[in-house]
Amino acid sequence: MDQKQIEEIVRSVMASMGQDVPQPAAPSTQEGAKPQCAAPTVTESCALDLGSAEAKAWIGVENPHRADVLTELRRSTAARVCTGRAGPRPRTQALLRFLADHSRSKDTVLKEVPEEWVKAQGLLEVRSEISDKNLYLTRPDMGRRLSPEAIDALKSQCVMNPDVQVVVSDGLSTDAITANYEEILPPLLAGLKQAGLNVGTPFFVRYGRVKIEDQIGEILGAKVVILLVGERPGLGQSESLSCYAVYSPRVATTVEADRTCISNIHQGGTPPVEAAAVIVDLAKRMLEQKASGINMTR
């Protein structure tokens, strides 16, 4: 699926929901005009906030031949470029930023989604067989199965046999859920209902792994299960969300190739609202083709 097809899907779904299609920002420079580039900053400072935009834009290459090229490269990516070297070693500020980002990523993995936040969203909360974060990280197999209490809760409080069941889980990034929730779940549910699909009761699974959606789909009799789960955080991005969609999942027979994944959902990647529109279209095609993953025809 190319960018033009994605834009057409987003435009169609957003129009059916009665919402305006977000327009891309106008370029800051005219075509052919030379961009105004700031001079690279090579001075290291212990007072600089390592998580600030200034620190991320820092250029550590001393006496560059083409400063404007470095500035444009630094603006074009969130990757660690233009950090410079001190002999064979990274510069102090580059190393400190690396350590700070690494610490932030570890914090994201270890944090818990607050119960108050889940209640504020009006979501039913269930758990996998995991009881705490340490067990979640060391026993991924238990994160693929619902607890007995969770099974009872789903059977008693959720709509049975829906066309589409939407599930939210913390996964390996708490920030991915809390940062993107309001911009992806409401338009996703609205788009599915606007498409005339029977949508199940959305709920939150604490300590869930991707394969847990197979058991959920089997218990509820869902035709399509959509799992929104936090991705493993990287050094530069801890708010990335993934969508794993599968048609008619079964614990015993569904394999990873049966899933369709849309990853990198966040403000710096695929915008959550745009992702919601693409997921709606994906769910419709899964129901039409009665397939998902590699079994879908393009």
UniProtKB/Swiss-Prot annotation:
InterPro entries: EutC, EutC_C. It is found in: Bacterial microcompartment. It catalyses: ethanolamine = acetaldehyde + NH4(+). Its cofactor is adenosylcob(III)alamin. Binds between the large and small subunits. Its EC number is 4.3.1.7. GO terms for biological process: amino acid metabolic process; ethanolamine catabolic process. Adenosylcob(III)alamin binds at V210, E231, C261. Artificial BMCs can be made in E.coli by expressing eutK, eutL, eutM, eutN, eutS (eutSMNLK) or eutS alone. Cargo proteins can be targeted to them using the first 19 residues of this protein. Beta-galactosidase (lacZ) was active within the BMC, showing the BMC allows passage of substrate into the interior. This can lead to the development of tailored BMCs for specific metabolic reactions. Belongs to the EutC family. This is Ethanolamine ammonia-lyase small subunit. It comes from Salmonella typhimurium (strain LT2 / SGSC1412 / ATCC 700720).
